[in-house]
Design a protein with these regions (language model features):
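ASCE RecA-like P-loop NTPase motor cores
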Residues: 15-611, 615-618
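Acidic, low-complexity intrinsically disordered tails
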Residues: 4-6, 10-20, 599-685, 689, ...
Length: 718
């Protein structure tokens, strides 16, 4: 029986160590500008060109071109996207194109993250608080495991999260357990290896990253894949290795060998831990003495108490809160050295593709500065050792050195990409489908909403979708509320909407649950929505970041995948950016029309199947999705977050006593347990929004209120 017949396809990635070639699976062949673009890019990579730029219009098949380049150069590849939503879309597409190869997804695993901070002006310290998405954590582990498995056919789709520090790849690799049937190893020795790989023991139902022992049988729930293993011992010998269903525990088959990768990216050896603790204590003594020499007794005492407590926690349980601030010691790095990151897990000859580079590159540049300003305060006021500054994202020049060969992909490349490519710019302006760029019309802003609703109604009657882009998140939410009252099936997405919720909303738009999607800058780059025939740009004449030539061109491109594509710019004057966008769009329309005429092509709509994104299956039924729309529409995931959050303004952090709070909010005294739970949930949503808006004092206040209410919940009777 074939190996792939025994176990799920995804598991095959992790115990096959054979070097495989990329196998592109597509019913289409490159056409239009694609063959020429693919050849030029492949030749550039083979000739060692450090940077190239693919200038491809929306709908010209840039993703398919990228896939063909990857298949031909046959190297491990990092595809970098500037937000999680587009990264998820690319991940889904590459999983389809390369079903037999290892395609991985690596983004930030925080659903909510409030960083540690100190505000000197008000003498307020805010402790770190976070919520981790377990599914994304699993996908991150799967990424590092695949890269260290020895396979060459690995594609990683990532956000800028790949710039942040993770564990030393040498330590991670040393903690991999390479098990073979017949190995001479005692059960207890094997259990110690699991603990060193950060798996934890349980006697209950297996959760991810746990193991259970019954006699000579050890069951393990892998941390990086939805699979369980059963290792059976006969004395001091491994008798059998089975892959099991993680819940039902039925067998997928037996295996002669299996590699078990660590349960956490931040893994280290006991020897390195002891060395790190010793160095932390040395630096602590030196920095405390420096504070005292400067007459800063408060800072000296604060630093001594905090670090001493952390050291004791590390000695006793192996970790502490904020252990990432000591990563330099555990990694064995010198002061000032860059942290290890995902790029260190790739082989030396990997290829980097930066999607929507005109946005992604500036984002990469900005990562280091924002992190440094926050850490500097923590160090200066005795909350952290100097080493905390070295727990940081990569600087831009460090990123450039770690990515020897890069392809920038954008419909509107910026000056940096063009200059670094030194004239190696590959144009892809022909759409194989024959689709033309959308028509652009300019409409006065007076009565723009009434006019827009009429246009939406026309598209809805044809079964088409509409995108509306506003200047602010608040405008998006208020317009969403108004459309809901007008019985328009609508939703919105922006930075306050959780990653998985964004993906669901986009899928629901394609499915017909919504007819309209409202957003801000998330509607500009890369969204692949062939059902969208109308893009409405409100306040198009308000010059700025969201209404410059590049942004407008990208927004116009969202309607370029539909046969009836049209863009309406609502404005009272035509700005220079608007005119450039209109002229460039018209130029591309003429090129496409000439190509269609020469090749006798009739434009045809893109038919793109809805598929699973990041483990979530797309619905296939038609009618039930429409039936569920009204209830879902009234409270989309982020709407209640923002409504709740807007009720609070930033204020100084206080820690009121329970009695003070009861006087301030007497309604709580009359709540039953169910009502209190709902109130706590609303506060939690407000806390998440406050943290995302960098209002850390407000988020900390809400966090403490939630803790107090949870403690008092038990005393409230029904």
């Amino acid at each position: 029986m074939l190996l792939t017949q025994i176990v799920p396809r995804s598991l095959f990635d992790f115990y096959t160590t054979s070097i495989m070639d990329f196998k592109l699976d597509s019913q289409y062949a490159p056409t239009g500008d694609q063959p020429q673009a693919i050849d030029q890019l492949v030749h550039g990579v083979d000739d060692g060109a450090p940077a190239q730029t693919l200038l491809g219009v929306t709908g010209s098949g840039k993703t398919f071109t990228m896939a063909n380049v990857i298949a031909r150069v046959n190297r491990p590849t990092l595809i970098l996207s500037h937000n999680k939503t587009l990264a998820a879309q690319l991940y889904s597409e590459f999983k389809q194109i390369f079903p037999e190869n290892s395609v991985q997804y690596f983004v930030s695993y925080y659903d909510y993250y409030q960083p540690e901070a100190y505000i000197p002006s008000s003498d307020k310290y805010i402790e770190k608080d976070l919520m981790i998405n377990e599914e994304i954590d699993r996908l991150r582990l799967a990424t590092t495991s695949a890269l260290l498995s020895g396979r060459r056919d690995v594609i990683v789709v990532s956000s800028v999260s790949c710039l942040y520090g993770i564990g030393n790849p040498e330590d991670f690799n040393e903690s991999v357990i390479d098990l073979h049937v017949g190995d001479r190893i005692s059960r207890n020795e094997f259990l110690r290896s699991l603990v060193n790989a950060l798996y934890s023991r349980t006697e209950l139902a297996l959760e991810r990253g746990q193991f259970r022992v019954k006699g000579d049988t050890v069951d393990i729930r892998l941390a990086y894949e939805d699979i369980a293993l059963r290792i059976t011992f006969w004395g001091d010998e491994v008798e059998s290795i089975q892959a099991l269903h993680p819940i039902e525990m039925y067998s997928f088959g037996k295996h002669d060998s299996f590699k078990i990768y660590p349960a956490n990216i931040f893994v280290t050896s006991p020897l390195r831990q002891a060395s790190a603790v010793a160095q932390i204590q040395l630096d602590l003594g030196r920095e405390v003495e420096n504070f005292r020499n400067e007459g800063k007794e408060l800072e000296a005492q604060r630093l001594y108490e905090r670090v001493t407590y952390d050291v004791e926690m590390i000695k006793e349980v192996g970790h502490c809160s904020g252990i990432e601030n000591y990563s330099r010691y555990f990694d064995g790095r010198e002061p000032g050295m860059r942290p290890f990151c995902l790029l260190d897990y790739f082989p030396d000859d990997f290829l980097t593709i930066i999607d929507e580079s005109h946005v992604t590159v500036p984002q990469i540049r900005a990562m280091y500065g924002g992190d440094l300003s926050r850490k500097t305060n923590l160090v200066q006021y005795g909350f952290r050792l100097q080493a905390a500054v070295d727990n940081r994202p990569l600087k831009f020049d460090e990123f450039e050195r770690l990515t020897p060969q890069t392809i920038y992909v954008s419909a509107t490349p910026a000056d940096y990409e063009l200059s670094r490519s030194e004239g190696i710019v590959v144009e892809q302006v022909i759409r194989p489908t024959g689709l033309l760029d959308p028509k652009i019309t300019v409409h006065p802003s007076e009565n723009q909403i009434d006019h827009l609703m009429e246009e939406i109604q026309l598209r809805t009657e044809r079964g088409e979708r509409t995108l509306v882009t506003t200047l602010t998140k608040r405008m998006a939410e208020e317009l969403n509320d108004y459309f809901c009252r007008m019985d328009i099936r609508t939703a919105y997405i922006h930075s306050d909407v959780d990653t998985m919720d964004r993906i669901r909303i986009l899928d629901d738009l394609r499915a017909g649950v919504y007819d309209v999607l409202i957003g801000v800058n998330l509607l500009r780059e890369g969204l692949d929505l062939p059902e969208v025939s109308l893009v409405a740009i409100l306040d198009a004449d308000k010059e700025g970041f969201l209404r410059n030539h590049r942004s407008l061109t990208q927004t116009v491109g969202r309607a370029a995948r539909n046969l009836n594509g049209e863009v309406i710019m609502y404005a009272d004057r035509i700005t220079e950016s608007m005119q450039r966008t209109i002229d460039e769009t018209e130029r591309r329309r003429k090129i496409q029309m000439q190509y269609n005429k020469e090749h006798n092509i009739t434009p045809k709509a893109i038919v793109k199947p809805r598929t699973s994104i990041v483990g979530m299956d797309a619905e296939t039924a038609d009618v039930p999705q429409f039936e569920a729309a009204p209830a879902y529409r009234q409270q989309p995931a982020a709407a209640k977050d923002r409504r709740g959050k807007q009720q609070h303004q930033p204020r100084a952090y206080v820690d009121p006593s329970p009695s003070q709070q009861q006087v301030a909010d007497p309604v709580l005294a009359f709540m039953n347990r169910e009502q209190l739970k709902k109130h706590i949930e609303r506060l939690r949503e407000q806390m998440i929004c406050a943290a995302k808006d960098m209002e850390f004092i407000e988020a900390a206040r809400l966090r403490d209120e939630i803790i107090r209410l949870e403690l008092s919940e038990q005393s409230i009777t029904e």
